[in-house]
Amino acid sequence: MPMFMDGASQVLQQVLQTVLVTSEPAIVIPGSFLGELDVIVDEAKNHGMKLVSIPKGGITILPPIPMSESSLTRLCKDYYGLKTDAERLALFSNLEETFPTAPGVSLPCRLLYHPRDYICRIVHLCAELVTASDEEYQKAYDIVPLLHIRPVQNVCEELRRQFRAGALTQRLPLGQRVDVQFKRTVVHLDGSMDPFPRNAAEAAVNIAPVALDAVDDIYEGFDVTGTEVVDIPTGKVSEYLSEKDFELVTEDSVLLDPTGKRVQAIFIRGGIDKDICRRAAADVEGVATKQNMRRLTNGGVRNPDTGILGYYDYLNNPTKRKCRMTEFTRRNWGKIIGPCGELLQLLDQLYKENAPDHYELQRRVIPPEYMLFNTVFSTVSVNKNFRTAVHRDKGDFRGGLTALCVLDGNYEGCYLALKSARKAFCLQVGDVLFFDSSLEHGNTEVHNREGSWRRISIVCYLRCGLMSHTCETERSMRLRNQIMSDRLHADSADSVVNLNGVTGHLPPLCIPFKIAKTLSLTQHAALRFVSRRIKEGDGCVLALTMGLGKTLVSLTICYSYIYNNGPCDILIVAPKTLLQHWMQEAKKWKDYGLVFPGFIVLNNVDSSSFEDDLSNYEQQGTTTNPKKSYVFVINPGYIKSFLSRVKGFRPALIVVDEGHCISSKESKLREVLDSLYCSARVVLTGTPVQNNAEELYRLVGWVDDKVHSTLPQRDFNEFSNSINRYVNGDDSAFCDALFAQRYIHEWMSPYVFTVMKVDLPPLHDYIIICNFSAVQQKMFEERIKVDATDNLLCLKASEHRPYHLSTHPLCFLGFLTGIWRTGQVDIEEEPGEFEELGTYRLSRDDDALAKDCSSLLENGKLADFVALSGKLTALISILHSIFEKMEKAVIFSQYIGSQDFIARTLTAYKISVVTIRGKDCQQRRRRVVEMFRDDKNVLCLVVSTQIGAYGLDLTAANHVILWDTWWNPQVESQAIARCYRQNQSKAVIAYKLASGFEDATVLKAQARKRALFKCLINEETSQVVPGHDLVDYTSSEEDDDRRHLWETLKTCTLEGGKPAVTKIIRNIDTVKSERWI
């Protein structure tokens, strides 16, 4: 049985085993050879090993220390007190019986060192450094990995402190046995090791109820203090600021940005009583230690004295529990609750009085469970004698301000300077500065001599990470488990349960118990997120990738809202193509207790059924027909008609499905919904950004227009421009783009709940570049008047002719003559597009081509007919490879002509195919989907992209063929999600067929938009990969069947002699991305 996790490479396993067997430290550099940093950290931590971030750029891995810190301290003191080497050797010999000679793990060979020798090395190191000068100690600290391990570091510093206080004088009598107990490493049946046995009694001391609520029992004894990633600059040491470069501010003042709209700083002289500050300083000074990762903001010489009080999000740290109170806060709650609580509440009041807009926004977005002492602050950084170099605070809520207050000290200088504003603020004890911590800031020089000054300050803020999906899901899991455990003994499984009932911080979230058992953790977290926003009188955006159950979340929210508030009306706006889906979902979950007094799905205000429903609705309020709750699900096209028919309609809650349509600059729907004056707004979308960043700005502003006050349009546009520059290939814009990404993401995070990953089988997404046949290329150049390889960018986005031509020359002629125009195309074409074509008559050449095509079909020469189109040739080969495995495929096309042409061609090949068109009624669509799902002989479905890309469950197929590309890549993502969603048990393969025209124009636009989406939503710094850097993937393909298919496609010959396919590209390779969180 392997000793290490599957995520670790074999080389990493060997390295860790070597350290365990020999006790020799290993210096490693994260990368593909060993594994990424998080894998190395997780593996080493899981087995009790110690990790140190030296040398620069690398990590030193050390074996576990099998001795408690208190025992190690006592042993070091005893060792230091002995006079001779003989006495010291005798001391170590007494450890023989109490030290285990081998760890309890399965090793490749026996242990090759005695653990006593490892302890001897540590003890001697500490003893040697007891009398060392600070300079000597620092030199040792820079090169000795053991000094970076918390127990060893603490022991050394404690002994040095006692030596300077004159406490290390007692000698240990010779022959006295040392009573030292060593901790054994516990090995579990699953192969994992727990080097930290739980000490529940110690962990429970002085923990407030709120703290207990924030910490799982299993983590009570695990202290991650010092591993918080707090605004760490990477790379070179940060610069220090000099006061000569700044204008000094000594009196109350407000500093605005150059536009005069955005607050940069508010300085309040003597804002807090000095006695209150000093009392608080005495209680929180202990938070500030050198156990941190902020050396670069302290001149790069040594770690400063700093620490975290309150709640923190350990998102980048090797701990299973990511969001919780810090160790110091839990252990000292009873001590700090008085003076510190009073101080923070006074700061909270000052914040409210001096920056009401920022305060109100921060108060509304902070999760109640993270309100430290019932303030708008979740987290406090405590700094002691810390002159910070230039940095930006990366995790603070961008819609609010950070509060800085000096609590105690005796110093001169050390002004807080804002670099861009050229202002420095003179803060003394009791002074308060509220400022935008995203701006570059730092302290100027201290006038006092080295070591002769003292300054204790706090920085209070709201951590955005506490509102992240990780924290929401983590807490939801604990709450759900507790609820499920409590309800196991309930009398009735049909009862309603309050998901937020186990905490007093959140509004009631009452739903049927059967539904609660069904919801995923993501859905639980989304429900809590929405309920909190609605309670605050705001709206929110649920940006969940396709297949995560947005509809069920929405219905559950509607149920809870009605349950809590009594009779009311709720409006759900959904595209016409999704109305049937809403009806089916409502019917499906009715059996689970999700029952609504009135549920009306409206597609046409002229229908007789609507009149009957409306009559019942209007007759409410009488003695015989009391008021009840109604949920209306309405097609956007009928909103105006509905409102004119139902006078005075005022919904208490509005839900907009596929709500990215709201973000359109000229959205008529937004205007109509605004007229309803409903602030409780929920937008459902898997694609909050489709074309540009401004869509996101408008979307967030629609759910709560107050957020624009903290990030004006001008500032957002500057951020957007920085991101766009980098996305489009300007590497010099990287730093600006990264900052802009972080700022925008943190600014919107309180209002946008984002989950873009789903636990499904793999998705393999390919772009297949198809050639034109000789006939296609000639027609392209003559009829569309553009050379097939040049000047393609001049074509309008609404140009449809190239798409029909890429299907087949005969399809192109049919489009020109109007054969396919009877039902219009299935996209929103620009007005006048078809009028530009006029009445087209076939030329002699056209007529001859049509007759030749007919002749090929009549004579059974299907291969020659297909060879007139690169896409059609590729399609037939792809389908044959799919059907050989008895698997199913869905073909998406946006054009009626292409859909019909594909279906007819497949029928000629005796392939059983069914179709769904835009003109089909809902009943026929449902029958076709059921036939495709249940009939094993039906292997192919041809469907309109605009119809089939939304709401349908096509998981019977695991192959998706995108026949024609379009400028918005999110439409294609929606199409793929019809098959790649919950209930899919197989790997899904997507084939995007692209002609030379699409490769040169549409695919480039798609890559840019995908990169932008990743930047803004996926927390990735992304950039478009130039076309000349995209290599063919055929030789790199790991799957034998697919590699054979790619080779086959390249050998297929078109009319004119060209190969059908020129290149196979992975879609993921068109954008290069790097995670930044």
Swiss-Prot record:
Residues 517-1075 are annotated as: DNA Helicase. Dioxygenase that catalyzes the first step of DNA base J (beta-d-glucosyl-HOMedU) biosynthesis by converting thymine to 5-hydroxymethyluracil (HOMedU). DNA base J is a hypermodified thymidine residue found in the genome of kinetoplastid parasites, which is localized primarily to repetitive DNA, namely the telomeres, and is implicated in the regulation of antigenic variation. Probably also acts as a DNA helicase. Recognizes and binds specific regions of the genome, hydrolyzes ATP and allows the DNA base J de novo synthesis. InterPro entries: 2OGFeDO_JBP1/TET_oxygenase_dom, Helicase_ATP-bd, Helicase_C-like, P-loop_NTPase, SNF2-like_sf, SNF2/RAD54-like_C, SNF2_N, SNF2_RAD54_helicase_repair. GO terms for cellular component: nucleus. In the C-terminal section; belongs to the SNF2/RAD54 helicase family. It comes from Trypanosoma brucei brucei (strain 927/4 GUTat10.1). Residues 1-516 are annotated as: Thymine dioxygenase. This is Bifunctional helicase and thymine dioxygenase JBP2.
